[in-house]
UniProtKB/Swiss-Prot annotation:
Zinc fingers, C4-type class: 56-71
Keyword Zinc part of the UniProt annotation: yes
UniProt keyword list: DNA damage, DNA recombination, DNA repair, Metal-binding, Zinc, Zinc-finger
Designated name of the protein: Recombination protein RecR
Domain Toprim per the UniProt entry, residue ranges: 79-174
The keyword Metal-binding appears for this protein: yes
GO terms, molecular function: DNA binding; zinc ion binding
Length: 198
């Protein structure tokens, strides 16, 4: 434990996702040893992000405008919507340069343990986006964990009542992974998603 404001800084940094006590302490001491100008700039950027960044009115992605750059891009295919849990998932998929459709960010996943149900997510907005018939395929790209699977199952059942093709991203063995370390579910999915090579 440190005295006063130093401990407060460590505690606040430790509240960030993925930052444990040791990382929080390292970051705090880095800040203490950094030039005042750089620390001030960091504080300004943090405040500016909170002021200027919002969520796209259409898809829920982060944006500095009412609609995000992806939803505004006329080169994107409006017949394809990829449903993800969080905006950071959009970034991950965009890095692949494989998907040229639009996105829909749910803002989380169904998690009864955490008290998150379908009404707490942007599912109603997704259904509204599908109403005009432009969308031909919805690709469900939720995380391959219990919450992501529950969300994918809920969405697939809900969307089968609409005139839209519903698909789920394949999951299976990671490139460079060893079979002996794969769990049964991952191996099972790898077999289900296998494709012909010759």
């Amino acid at each position: 434990m440190y005295a006063g404001i130093v401990q407060e800084l460590i505690d606040e940094l430790g509240r960030l996702p993925g930052i444990g006590p040791k990382s929080a302490q390292r970051i705090a001491f880095h800040i203490l040893q950094t030039e005042a100008f750089d620390v001030t700039r960091l504080a300004e950027v943090l405040l500016e992000v909170r002021d200027k960044v919002r969520f796209c009115e259409i898809c829920g992605n982060v944006s500095e405008q009412a609609t995000c750059s992806i939803c505004r891009d006329p080169r994107r295919d409006p017949a394809l919507i990829c449903v993800v849990e969080e905006a950071k998932d959009v970034v991950a998929i965009e890095r692949t340069r494989e998907f040229r459709g639009l996105y829909h960010v749910l803002g989380g996943a169904i998690s009864p343990i955490d008290g998150v149900g379908p009404d707490d997510l942007r599912i109603r907005q997704l259904v509204q986006r599908l109403a005009d018939g432009t969308v031909q395929e919805v690709i469900i790209a939720t995380d391959p964990n219990l919450e992501g699977e529950a969300t994918a199952t809920y969405l697939s059942r809900l969307l089968t009542t609409l005139e839209v093709r519903v698909t789920r991203l394949a999951s299976g063995l990671p490139v460079g992974g060893d079979l002996e370390y794969a769990d049964e579910v991952t191996l099972g999915r790898a077999f289900e998603g296998r494709r012909q090579v010759s």
